[in-house]
Amino acid sequence: MITSQLLHPASIVVVGASNNVHKPGGAILKNLLSGGYTGELRAVNPKETEVQGVAAFADVKDIPDTDLAILAIPAALCPDAVEMLAAEKQVKAFIILSAGFGEETHEGAVLEDRILETVNRYGASLIGPNCIGFMNSWHHSVFSQPIPQLHPQGVDLISSSGATAVFILESAVTKGLQFNSVWSVGNAKQIGVEDVLQYMDEHFDAENDSRIKLLYIESIGDPDRLLFHASSLIRKGCKIAAIKSGSSESGSRAASSHTGAIASSDSAVEALFRKAGIVRCYSREEL
């Protein structure tokens, strides 16, 4: 579920905000500030009254109602925070940067399940967990660098891997490539690559939307939906290029260790991409 509060939030809270810009909670707040976000910005940090010039609250229960919550706190604390924010603070979008979920342990997977049940019950979006975030021209909710030039006619990048997204951004920035949006879906507990493509297809604006989509996929949860919406976007004039990681046995293990993903066979991926009209790339440099 992709809500308007994820794409165009009028207010954002960073839970676990920090004055240390080398921590995710500090880096993402810095990027929001330097990116010129014009909405209401709040921080939650029990040890500070102000973080990077932003008013800080001791607990999530103390903040005003907010559209988007970014969580940079230990995984074990996330389910209760999400419940409070969704139930009491009307939050309709969550970005969870934290690792330590289903990509690591069974206990972590249980935490993810609790979070998913909560966000679905309250009709909220969830990016992550275990991701670098999301950005568009409205807000730079990522903890990584670089921040590329953002333009409605730029490229849409959807990546299962935050590290790969950063690598692609670093390469693209040196070439002057502009972006419309960057989606780091991480463990993709609610929103995966297929969901983003579906949203882009169903809301496609031929006059204003980007026509170039770059995908880095670690698992394909719903091949039929990916095929349908990729094919539809291509018929509308879009170009889609993609890497499917983990096609080899060693690559499958790497993909699984990163996101808890189960990789698809190489022959199935090849057939799917060919049928959809997706240009398959075999390296990040090629993409």
Give residue ranges: language-model regions.
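Catalytic-core regions of core metabolic enzymes
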Residues: 1-286
